[in-house]
A protein has these predicted regions:
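Helical cap/lid subdomains and adjacent loops of hydrolase enzymes that gate the active-site channel
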Residues: 27, 36-41, 46-50, 74-90
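Alpha-helical elements of Rossmann-like donor-binding domains used by nucleotide-donor carbohydrate transfer enzymes
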Residues: 22, 26, 46, 60, ...
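Short, acidic loop-to-helix structural element flanking the phosphoryl-transfer center
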Residues: 67, 76-106, 147, 190
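Short beta-strand segments
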Residues: 12, 17, 106-110, 168
Length: 203
């Protein structure tokens, strides 16, 4: 495999640690309901998946979430809960900053559009270098492991599968990307990223 010209990185699980439970609890406190009610509204009823797939606008998503938990949720409250439940290690932050100085880097994440604001707030040092490089499923209109998610990401960067390294914590996503010809590697924790980049000749 040649040295990659593009590196596509998952966010949650690869670049950041993320706790659903912390997020649900944070939203529950701000809305005055139980965390389990938030979890059911987002996960059991498919609301989160529809937003992540681009089937709902941010306004529609927040309105439906508010209806489901019996309290209004605005974008600021949603982003605050997501930030509180997500952590980017300083070593990972520095690793991506250095990597982006050597090769094209994109973030390919199954998230809705509000996540753009969250990532910018969590790791401002990545910007403006990564402006235009955050490819969220809500904007792409496809979620990993759907082939369209990878194909649209490659088209966005004008890259070929054979020159692209893809790193994700999901074995299913890695297998789907590999099936399309990407050099796909699984990182089950953020600390694994540096090793993978070294193996690919990028560190």
């Amino acid at each position: 495999m040649p040295r990659p010209r593009l590196v596509l990185l998952d966010f949650d699980g690869v670049l950041a640690s993320y706790s659903h439970a912390v997020r649900f609890s944070h939203l529950a406190r701000s809305s005055g309901c139980a965390p389990e009610r938030v979890r059911r509204a987002l996960m059991d009823d498919g609301l989160e998946a529809r937003y992540d797939a681009g089937l709902l606008s941010t306004g529609e998503y927040l309105h439906q979430l508010g209806d489901a938990i019996g309290a209004g949720i605005d974008a600021a409250s949603w982003c605050a809960a997501r930030r509180a439940s997500t952590h980017v290690d300083p070593d990972t932050e520095a690793c991506v900053s250095a990597l982006a100085g050597r090769v094209a880097v994109g973030i390919l994440s199954n998230n809705g559009l509000l996540m753009c604001e969250v990532i910018r707030a969590l790791v401002p040092s990545w910007f403006p270098r990564l402006d235009g490089a955050m490819l969220l499923s809500g904007a792409l209109g496809a979620r990993k492991p759907e082939p369209a998610a990878f194909q649209r990401a490659l088209a966005h960067f004008g890259a070929s599968a054979g020159n692209t390294l893809f790193v994700d914590d999901s074995a299913t996503h890695v297998a789907a990307a590999a099936g399309l010809g990407l050099d796909a590697r699984q990182a089950e924790e953020p600390a694994a990223l540096q090793r993978i980049l070294s193996d690919a000749g990028l560190a």
